[in-house]
């Protein structure tokens, strides 16, 4: 194992060196061709041996990877994992416990129980019956939250439950309602990217007292905005509706004593989604669903004689099958436990604060840049939307489609060249028109605003070259490198 691990680390380094940036150059077709060449044949008549196969496959993956440890990779809620978390994940793979029965995961089950109790207390510090389960991420957490709401309604003799979501809600909520056979969710109006309490009041009033679940968002995907949770909770309670908060992005703000007040009111929700593979720096997957009352998780319980026979449970063997909608389940909790124990609440909170502060400083850099402008309003949790002034000039000359086309072209060209990975979002501008923006989602726990400024120069230079074609004069000199980091395990994994 040690020898193979060394091979894998060498392959990661060699692949990253060959890539040379945050993303492989050439676009989808070239990347696919290079990757296939490096791993072929996938199923030879005679194998090449463990070390050669491992090196070839890992090097191919690294050479063709999007590297979130590079500050210029800032498109998505896609964090660079902490080295200690990646190392713990290696141990999880080596031990290979399956979390569906005690006889497959004796110690891992105890670790999960201890960790989920703490993760529940992060959300519900005053609730004596709070609990949490580990999920594969926000999509699964939201699905389970809606499932539990449906089961609670049916236990009260109701046929179903009506879900209400903001225009800003993550698509997984509507998909969960579809999967569960629930009525099509009612969409509640938003203003400036946040759900309007008055609009929620009108929507709930129209239901005439039918059972309802309001899904608020704490950290929208496009902008990192937080719904007005106290007001939404008050409106929901006035109609006897339940509240679920999708805090897949924003939930880890609760680790910071300074930032936790941004989520005031979240404790009034019956359930809360939050991810640790976003603002938590865990390898995917590391999701959490916290519930205010653990008895609601009873809806997940079932019997399978080979896993949790009645007599085994009565004899004292723990029943793990009701801790997930999955059966076979890897011990994702090991990396979470390692990180929480290593950093403590203050350490995790400090990293969250760093990302939030970096986003604020990055937004200030955009505001000072003569060729760029930021979307009006405060930056989201750690998300900044901006676009080149050259796009606005095209709007004046040829309309909104021309301006948006320039923004899209800048993003795609930088992707194809492997220079930068920026996201895209459609959001309302100061004049009420919805326009396309470049999106920087800043989750690097060590990067600074100075490390990120080259992104702005890349965008500005490309906007100039596309709006007014001329020979390229910039590009190669704008790559930023992070300063060396100190502290074993606190560094992120660079691929």
Each language-model region and where it sits:
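Active-site C-terminal subdomain of aminotransferase-like
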Residues: 264-370
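Short amphipathic alpha-helices in soluble, non-transmembrane regions
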Residues: 404-414, 452-460
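Conserved PLP-binding active-site segment of the aspartate aminotransferase-like
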Residues: 382-395, 400, 419-454
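Conserved PLP-enzyme active-site core in the AAT-like
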Residues: 141-298
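PLP-dependent enzyme catalytic core of the Aspartate aminotransferase-like
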Residues: 428-495
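Conserved glycine-rich beta-strand-loop-beta hairpin in the small C-terminal domain of fold type I
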Residues: 356-360, 376-386
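Short loop-beta-helix segment that forms the pyridoxal 5′-phosphate
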Residues: 120-144, 188-189
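N-terminal entrance/gating region of PLP-dependent enzymes' catalytic architecture
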Residues: 1-129, 418-424, 441-443, 447, ...
């Amino acid at each position: 194992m040690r020898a193979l691990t060394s091979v894998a680390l060498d392959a990661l380094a060699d692949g990253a060196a060959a890539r040379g940036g945050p993303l492989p150059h050439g676009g989808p077709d070239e990347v696919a061709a290079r990757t296939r060449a490096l791993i072929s044949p996938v199923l030879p008549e005679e194998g090449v041996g463990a070390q050669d196969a491992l090196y070839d496959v890992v090097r191919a993956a690294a050479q063709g990877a999007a590297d979130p440890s590079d500050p210029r990779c800032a498109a998505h809620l896609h964090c660079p994992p902490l080295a200690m978390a990646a190392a713990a994940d290696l141990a999880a793979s080596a031990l290979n416990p399956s979390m569906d029965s005690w006889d497959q995961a004796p110690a891992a089950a105890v670790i999960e129980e201890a960790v989920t109790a703490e993760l529940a207390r992060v959300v519900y510090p005053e609730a004596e019956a709070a609990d949490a389960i580990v999920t594969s991420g926000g999509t699964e957490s939201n699905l389970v939250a809606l499932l539990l709401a449906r089961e609670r309604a049916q236990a009260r003799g109701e046929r179903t439950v009506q879900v209400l979501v903001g225009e800003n809600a993550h698509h997984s909520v509507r998909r969960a309602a579809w999967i569960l056979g629930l009525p099509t969710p009612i969409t509640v109006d938003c203003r400036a990217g946040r759900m309007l309490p008055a609009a929620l009041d009108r929507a709930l009033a129209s239901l005439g007292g039918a059972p309802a679940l309001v899904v608020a968002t704490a950290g929208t995907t496009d902008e990192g905005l937080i719904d007005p949770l106290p007001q939404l909770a008050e409106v929901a309670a006035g109609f006897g509706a339940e509240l679920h908060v999708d805090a897949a992005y924003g939930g880890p703000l609760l680790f910071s004593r300074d930032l936790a007040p941004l989520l005031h009111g979240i404790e009034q929700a019956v359930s809360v989604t939050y991810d640790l593979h976003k603002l938590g720096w865990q390898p995917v997957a590391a999701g959490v669903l916290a519930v205010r009352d653990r008895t609601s998780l009873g809806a997940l319980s079932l019997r399978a004689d080979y896993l949790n026979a009645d007599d085994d449970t009565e004899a004292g063997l723990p029943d793990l099958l009701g801790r997930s909608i999955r059966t076979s389940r890897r011990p994702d909790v090991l990396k979470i436990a390692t990180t929480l124990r290593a950093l403590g609440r203050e350490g995790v909170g400090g990293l969250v604060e760093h990302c939030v502060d970096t986003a604020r400083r990055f937004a200030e850099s955009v505001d000072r840049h003569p060729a760029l402008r930021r979307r009006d309003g405060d930056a989201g949790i750690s998300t900044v939307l901006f676009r080149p002034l050259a796009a606005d000039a095209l709007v004046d000359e040829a309309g909104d489609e021309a301006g948006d086309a320039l923004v899209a072209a800048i993003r795609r060209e930088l992707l194809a060249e492997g220079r930068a990975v920026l996201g895209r979002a459609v959001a309302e501008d100061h004049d009420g028109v919805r326009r396309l923006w470049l999106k920087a989602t800043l989750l690097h726990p060590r990067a600074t605003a100075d490390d990120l400024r080259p992104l702005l120069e890349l965008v500005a230079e490309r906007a100039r070259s596309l709006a007014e074609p001329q020979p390229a004069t910039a590009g190669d000199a704008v790559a930023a490198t992070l300063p060396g980091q100190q502290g074993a395990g606190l560094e992120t994994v660079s691929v």
